[in-house]
Amino acid sequence: MIIESSAPTRVDLAGGTIDIPPLFLFHEGAATVNFAVSLMARCRIETRNDDKIVLESIDRGEKFETSLANISDLKDEPRLELLSKLVYFFKPETGFKMTTESEAPAGAGLAGSSTLNIACIGALNKLVGNRYVPERFIPIAAAVECQVIKVPTGYQDYYSAQYGGVAAIHFRPDAIEREPLTIDTGTLQIRIVVLYTGEPRNSGTNNWEITKNHIDGDREIFNIFEGIRDTSLNLREALLKNNWTEVGEILRESYPQRKRLSPNITTPQMDLLINKALNNGAIAAKVCGAGGGGCIAFFCEENSKQAVEKALAEEAGAEVLDWKLSEEGLTVNEISDSKFQIPD
């Protein structure tokens, strides 16, 4: 049997960090806005006719094997830690090889690890006979990722991976609700440049410091988060109205707010790239994820996307990413045929 799954990464436009529990409980109306992009995370499982478990990450260049009898050792396995903990959680009863690959650059701030998490959960769940309904995938993903990074993890990334599209994610005491946003996606695609700066980042470190300070009662951080909440809600309204002038204004005004929350959200190289984009037709810059490296999304003036991309491509180490909006989220496909089994 062969199982293949894929899920899209995302660009977050507003509300980042407020999706981390328990922070959203302190800000009534907390929400994020993001859209899924066609830089996919993929997982492939091939069953075996022995008891071996083989885990391989193509983009990380890592591979190791164990056995069904030693599956409990995966709980504390440092190699390919996310994959190991997911396999330990699902505890399949047949030998298999699991291979993963991500199209997004490592440390890009596009939710690559969270997206891979969802893709692997979809495939592993199929392997164990659809033990969980899809509505359980996101809570499982958040719990396992928290075990890996050892700090609380935000929830918005899993929703874009599982469902795709453009959405506002609303965080309430009784539930987290995904609201699909019906907007002019064509305009979104022709006005946003996604740039990988060439500098990877660690989102857990940045977000944990902010979370700790918020819980410790830092009033300035509380007020910044109130503004982040308002930005998300205002951006949602502007997108639903297809008011792209207002979208640009909101994104431009939110950048200093994010810098106040985390001064290290940009590096000197990122500041250089942002200034170059703004001088060549970009209206606003949005650092993707927790920042400190990774990707930047630029909202451009009408008919200016190509000029912005050309200017940024001239900078050493920077890579303009080719993306499309991904309307589809997680997909899982099964091929059941004994001829695909890996022999002893």
Pin down the residues of each PLM region.
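DPxDG-like acidic metal-binding loop motif
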Residues: L110-P134
